[in-house]
Amino acid sequence: MFPTHRPRRLRSSETLRRMVRETTLTSADFIYPLFAVPGEGVAKEVTSMPGVYQLSIDKIVEEAKEVYDLGIPSIILFGIPTDKDNDATGAWHDCGIVQKAATAVKEAVPELIVAADTCLCEYTPHGHCGYLEVGDLSGRVLNDPTLELLRKTAVSQAKAGADIIAPSGMMDGFVATIRDALDEAGFSDTPIMAYSAKYASAYYGPFRDAAESTPQFGDRRTYQMDPGNSREALKEVELDVAEGADIVMVKPALSYMDIICRIKETTDLPVAAYNVSGEYSMVKAAALNGWIDEERVVLETLTSFKRAGADLILTYHAKDAARWLA
């Protein structure tokens, strides 16, 4: 005797499948990362990230207009300065590359939400996310002195027009410090999207080519999270929420969907997932070799992040995905 319930009944046509679909992906879910460099007319493709470019500010503005026209509501800016120093001056100077890019984008596309990555690794000669002890080659960042740099960076970015401040350095207390600095400077309405559960991942390799931020010695395991930990992620989120975060993030996304799911179950705040460079480049490499259907794999992957609980997805696939979803 056949069963009374036949799940295939609701899979019999595309229209019916769409009607009962539990998770729907849209271009409004995306935040598109952009890499700003000095100069004019610069569009230099990142070798390890096909289709991703380092862009001068005039080209950033062109991209921003295209992104907005595709229905993508937000970008996040990363900067590659001309000069680097131990005080990460390029991160917090009012004439820094991210500050200039944020101002230019907001003037050209005021409706587009501009997030600013608030970190220091692109701006230091050693590639670590803050101050180091003199002579220390382990990469152990001095936490509290670094917080002062993050305060200045966040305020400078907000003054330049950034709509969202996104601290990514995984310093203890960085959300509270930045919240206090923003409030003190008159930016109490500027939200913080905290990289709350940022793992010390091997998936970041291509990004470090794009941002020119590879550590020159040591690694980042003394401040980014151990990939084997999940309870620690919940603690990090709990701390960031208590300190005033408005959005919490999991990075990377693909290997950490269990973390996205657990965090979504513990907080009412929006949860962002960062579909990182290594995840992107693996898909691009396989697609360029004809091994996979790029469109289907990308949309399936992004849908899975949302199904796991992500409200927002930072992804280099954003423009392509928006076109495919249109």
UniProtKB/Swiss-Prot annotation:
Acetylation recorded as keyword: no
Needed co-factor(s): Zn(2+)
Binding site for 5-aminolevulinate 1: 208, 220
SUPFAM superfamilies documented for this protein: Aldolase
Catalytic function, reaction form: 2 5-aminolevulinate = porphobilinogen + 2 H2O + H(+)
Record: residues binding Mg(2+): 236
A Pfam family recorded for this sequence: ALAD
Enzymatic class: lyase
Domain of life: Bacteria
Signal sequence residues: none
InterPro entries found in the cross-reference section: ALAD, ALAD_AS, Aldolase_TIM
GO BP: protoporphyrinogen IX biosynthetic process
One GO MF term: porphobilinogen synthase activity
EC number: 4.2.1.24
Matches recorded under Gene3D superfamilies: Aldolase class I (3.20.20.70)
Active site: 198 (schiff-base intermediate with substrate), 251 (schiff-base intermediate with substrate)
Keyword terms: Heme biosynthesis, Lyase, Magnesium, Metal-binding, Porphyrin biosynthesis, Zinc
Binding site for 5-aminolevulinate 2: 277, 316
Role played: Catalyzes an early step in the biosynthesis of tetrapyrroles. Binds two molecules of 5-aminolevulinate per subunit, each at a distinct site, and catalyzes their condensation to form porphobilinogen.
Oligomer and partners: Homooctamer.
Similarity annotation: Belongs to the ALAD family.
Name of protein: Delta-aminolevulinic acid dehydratase
